[in-house]
Each structure stands twice: as C-alpha cells, then as structure tokens.
Swiss-Prot record:
Activity-regulation annotation: Protease activity is inhibited by EDTA.
Oligomer and partners: Interacts with DdrOC.
Pfam family, any one: Peptidase_M78
Native organism taxonomy: Bacteria, Thermotogati, Deinococcota, Deinococci, Deinococcales
Stretches for region Disordered: 262-281
GO molecular function, one term: metal ion binding
Protein name, UniProt field: Radiation response metalloprotease IrrE
Organism per entry: Deinococcus deserti (strain DSM 17065 / CIP 109153 / LMG 22923 / VCD115)
Length: 281
C-alpha cells in the first residue's frame, strides 16, 4: 500500500513561499533586463550556449547558469528567471526541508520544477504589475497582451500569471492559426485553434490545446479584421458544447488573445461538464 498523497495545502504553502522568495529577490534588483536579473546572485555567472533541446540549467557546484542561445529571447528570459528560482530555492533550507518531508523521487523533482516556474512568473510579472493591468483593462485579452509586452514574456507564460491574479470566473486563451491535417494535395486549410488556456481560481476547466474556434466566433472575427472585439458570445469547447460568456478578443500579429468572462454561478462544472479539469497545455 502506498502512502497517501500530501494534502494540496502543502504545495500551496510551498508556492506561496516561492513567491515570497522571488518578490524579495526582485525588490532588490535595479531592473528586469537580463543582466539586472543576475544582480542579486553573488558569485554566479551567466553563460549562453547551444543546448539542443534543453532551455537552460543551473549548476550549483560550478556556480553557473546556462541558457540555450538558440531559442527565442522571451523564452531565454523566462528560463533565466526559472534557473534563478532554482538558486533561490536551494538557498532556503526551511523550504527544502519541507519539500523533502512531503515528496520524494520523481514527484519531488516535478514539484521543484513547478515551484521554479512559479518563482519565474513572480519575478518577471510582479503582483503589482498584474493588479495594475487588471485595474486598467479588466480581465481581458488586452490585459493579457499588455502583460506579455511589459514583462517581455510569451503570451502563454503571461496567461497563467494573469489567471492566478484574476478574481472573477474567467478563462483566458491564446489562439492562433494552424493547418489541419488533410490527405489531399497542399495539406489542409488553416483553422483558428487554442494554443494554451488557463482559468481563474474556482473555474474547474479550461480549453484544451487544439480546440477549434468557429469562423463566426468573435475571436476568429477579431483576428480576421485585426480589430479588438468584445461582445456576448460563448466558450467553444471541443465537445461542441457552448457555454455563454462575455468574450474579449485582442488580435496581435498572427494570434488572438482572448478572455471568456463566465456568468455568475457558472464557475463550477455541472454533471454535463464540457472539459476535464486541467485539460490544457
């Protein structure tokens, strides 16, 4: 018989502590550019080099952070913040002790990686910045676009951070055109699909990656016209079910950033829920 899984509060407490570490570290930085991010790590050097499929690594024995020089700048930036979070975590004996008490093996490694993502998000996207954008723009596609731009991170990274700070029941999504598989010559036609999705606390489902967005949906119309669009519409679940929502779609280059504000009382799934909890990428 295996031991019961640790209660969710253990991970929640660890995430809260990781955010505190990142916020404290970030408060002492002169800026958020690449070299300023390293300012608080005495004796640790930063090296960019080709790393194949790896984004980066932190080597505490040799006091060096390695970043893949062949990936996009915004990915390098998030990876750097992730590796800095590894250094911060290793410097907190109490947090390390708590983690080893609660987890072991592969699960311990998974939790550590999760915490370093939490730390990276808190470092690059401080709560004050997110709250300011939510105050100015509300929980909208525009807020998501502004967060990604001002924090200089990918829209996918931004949507998870924005969802965590959003109080009302809202689903966020990054959508882009993708070519559908087709056995005919020239391949299939392009279709707007969900690339990533996350929801605010209390919303037990989100949109699966690859979910198609109908051509007449506000998100598709916004991308087609290159104009922001906000109106009453629906969440287009892959199952075909449509949940009423106020849709705010903000087109940006070849993608559209979308928020789905759910009606009050619809944040909990019912017996005919459209998507499995956590079904996202």
């Amino acid at each position: 018989m295996t031991d019961p899984a640790p209660p969710p509060t253990a991970l929640a407490a660890a995430k809260a502590r990781m955010r505190e570490l990142a916020a404290s570290y970030g408060a002492g930085l002169p800026g958020r550019d690449t070299h300023s991010l390293m300012h608080g790590l005495d004796g640790i050097t930063l090296t960019f080099m080709p790393m194949g499929q790896r984004d980066g690594a932190y080597d505490p024995e040799h006091h060096v952070i390695l970043i893949n020089s062949q990936v996009r700048p915004e990915r390098q930036r998030f990876t750097l913040a992730h590796e800095i979070s590894h250094a911060l975590l290793l410097g907190d004996d109490d947090l390390l002790s708590d983690l080893h008490d609660e987890y072991e093996g592969d699960r311990l490694e998974q939790v550590i990686e999760t915490l370093c993502n939490v730390g990276a998000a808190a470092l690059l996207m401080p709560a004050e910045l997110i709250d300011d954008l939510l105050t100015r723009f509300g929980p909208t596609g525009r807020a998501l676009a502004e967060l990604a731009r001002r924090a200089d991170v990918s829209a996918t990274s931004a949507l998870y951070a924005l969802a965590e700070r959003t109080a009302p029941p809202v689903i966020y999504a990054v959508c882009a055109l993708s070519r559908q598989e087709d056995e005919g010559e020239g391949g299939g036609a392009k279709e707007l699909t969900v690339r990533a999705s996350s929801a605010s606390a209390g919303v037990k489902y989100s949109l699966s990656a690859g979910t198609p967005v109908p051509d007449d949906h506000p998100a598709a119309l916004a991308l087609d016209t290159r104009l922001p669009l906000a109106q009453d519409s629906y969440v287009p679940f892959r199952s075909g079910r449509r949940m009423p929502a106020y849709v705010d779609a903000f087109p940006e280059r070849q993608r559209v950033l979308v928020s789905f504000a759910l009606p009050a009382g619809r944040s909990e799934p019912d017996a005919d829920k459209p998507e499995a909890p956590g079904d996202q990428s």
